[in-house]
A protein has these predicted regions:
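Structural motif corresponding to the C-terminal cap of alpha-helices
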Residues: 116-124, 149, 190, 368, ...
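Alpha-helical transmembrane segments of multi-pass membrane proteins
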Residues: 462-464
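Flexible helix-coil linker/hinge segments at domain or subdomain boundaries
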Residues: 453-460
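Small/polar-residue-rich segments within soluble enzyme cores
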Residues: 1-98, 425
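Beta-lactam-recognizing serine transpeptidase/beta-lactamase-like catalytic domain environment
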Residues: 80-92, 131-176, 181-427, 457, ...
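A short acidic/glycine-rich loop-to-helix N-cap element
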Residues: 428-439
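Conserved, well-ordered alpha-helix/loop/beta-strand core segments that scaffold catalytic motifs
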Residues: 4, 26, 85-129
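Solvent-exposed, polar/charged alpha-helical surfaces in well-ordered, non-transmembrane soluble domains
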Residues: 5, 13, 17, 21, ...
Length: 476
């Protein structure tokens, strides 16, 4: 037999007050707590939400359910008379094993990121978009936003597609942003040099019966120009100088194929075909960012390697936990041998040598300067390093790449020589223009410029507009 049943939950307080005096004996009201999200849709996909019993259902609420909700607290009581129970004499009053989490998110940066990714998607007449802002040196995630979003307070009014934190759950083919990985791997292996020129085959190159094309036809390009002009043909030629297994090792070292371990819920590892299965077409395509699935956060972590002179910095979202006594904790070891929680920055890992990272960073700076594909990412008074990306979307129904759907992106960091923030902007299926330099770069510019002002990094006199030749000492 059940001694208790709910008749209705979360009723309006005014209605409860009106009914209170009219209810028969045995029927009453119970006050319940519920999670309220004062910023409404801001950070909705990241935070997630709780259900009617305060259980985490999505996002960080789900990821850290056991910490945020705590364990049920038991009380030792004795019965006094027929109904009343009181705690036993001397029963210790212990706080429940419940924690709060201090996130790395800066609410000011989150607000402007939400605003500009929404504007970018609307102006590009696109399906959706994602933007991530990360502290370059520590890996702290300062903002993560996807548009369209949803209000966690009213989650039942939205479809499940709105709940996805596409910064970590959605895979996409990165396109030309991936070329920085290809160039750095080939430079590290000594297979190319800064003073080389590459034959662009007048805009069309055939590999294994597959035609690779450049947007603009070129005869020859220097190594800097390969990235600045974003040549697919030259990137394919450079990538194919690497053996598949060596290339695959570099790709994995940059974090692709494994979860970023940021603390965000539902991280996807992406998808990389094993090197032993690569055809010549696979090898060439991966060299310019097609045929590999990555998450936006994975791509940002890889870009950030060049902001850190060759070191990979693990992203993180939780600065520390706070217990019921107000103590800050960087680690929690639950009893019973369950998985430990560790918060805050982690130790960085060297991926490539500083000389290689510095050289590729100079190439990335040229991308945002006069004649580069991301002139719209440049910010007056700040030097910007970055790379555009425009990739086709594979259509499983057709069994080939779509001719109408694209992903446009731009990822980079600023100030280029002393990076404070690394940012990636991704626009899915833009209809106004399909190029990352046109639709994603301006969103990056606005987010980066305003973030610099928030962080009190003020503009300096403008840098020279272009740099076609770079000399690098072997001893640097």
């Amino acid at each position: 037999k059940r001694s208790f049943v709910w008749l209705k939950r979360r009723i309006d307080p005014e209605l409860a007050k009106a009914l209170e005096k009219q209810l028969p004996k045995g029927i009453g009201f119970v006050d319940e707590f519920r999670r309220y999200y004062p910023q409404r849709s801001e950070g909705g996909q990241m935070l997630g939400f709780t259900g009617i019993d305060s259980q985490g259902l999505e996002g960080l609420e789900y990821q850290y359910e056991s910490l945020l909700k705590g364990k049920p607290q038991g009380y030792i009581v004795e019965k006094e008379g027929t109904y009343r129970t009181v705690p036993l004499k001397g029963y210790p009053e212990r706080p429940p094993e419940q924690f709060s989490l201090q996130l790395t998110i800066d609410s000011r940066i989150q607000h402007l990121t939400e605003k500009h990714i929404a504007q970018g998607v609307i102006e590009a007449q696109a399906d959706r978009g994602t933007a991530i802002v990360m502290d370059s040196s520590s890996g702290a995630i300062l903002a993560v936003a996807s548009y369209p979003g949803f209000d966690p307070n009213r989650y039942r009014q939205f479809s499940r597609a709105h709940f996805l934190n596409r910064a970590v759950t959605s895979g996409y083919e990165p396109g030309s942003t991936f070329k920085i990985i290809t160039l750095s791997a080939a430079l590290s292996e000594g297979l190319i040099s800064v003073d080389q020129n590459f034959d662009c085959e007048n805009g069309e190159y055939k590999v294994g019966g597959h035609r690779i094309r450049d947007v603009k036809k070129h005869q020859q390009l220097s190594l800097l120009q390969v990235l600045k002009k974003s040549s697919n043909i030259c990137a394919a030629k450079i990538g194919m100088r690497l053996s598949p297994h060596v290339f695959q090792d570099y790709i994995k070292n940059f974090g692709f194929g494994s979860r970023p371990d940021s603390g965000l819920a539902a991280e996807a590892p992406g998808k990389l075909l094993p090197a032993k299965k690569w055809t010549a077409v696979d090898h060439a395509s991966i060299s310019f960012g097609q045929g590999i699935l990555v998450s936006p956060l994975q791509m940002l972590v890889a870009i950030n390697v060049f902001a850190n002179r060759g070191k990979l910095v693990t992203p993180f979202t939780v600065q520390h936990a706070i217990d019921a006594s107000g103590n800050s904790l960087n680690q929690i070891d639950p009893p019973g041998g369950s998985e430990s929680y560790r918060f805050g920055p982690k130790e960085s890992k060297r991926i490539i040598e500083p000389q290689v990272a510095d050289l590729v960073r100079e190439f990335m700076i040229s991308v945002t300067q006069e004649g580069g594909t991301a002139r719209r990412a440049s910010i007056e008074g700040y030097q910007v390093a970055g790379k555009t990306g425009t990739s086709q979307v594979y259509d499983p129904k057709l069994g080939r790449y779509s001719k109408t759907q694209y992903v446009a992106s731009f990822g980079g960091f600023t100030p280029a020589k002393d990076p404070r923030v690394s940012i990636l902007v991704l626009i899915r299926n833009p209809r106004k223009s399909l190029y990352g330099g046109v639709v994603a770069a301006p969103v990056f510019r606005e987010i980066a410029r305003k973030t610099m002002l928030i962080q009190k990094v003020f503009p300096e006199p403008s840098q020279p507009n272009d740099q076609e030749s770079i000399r690098v000492s072997r001893n640097d």
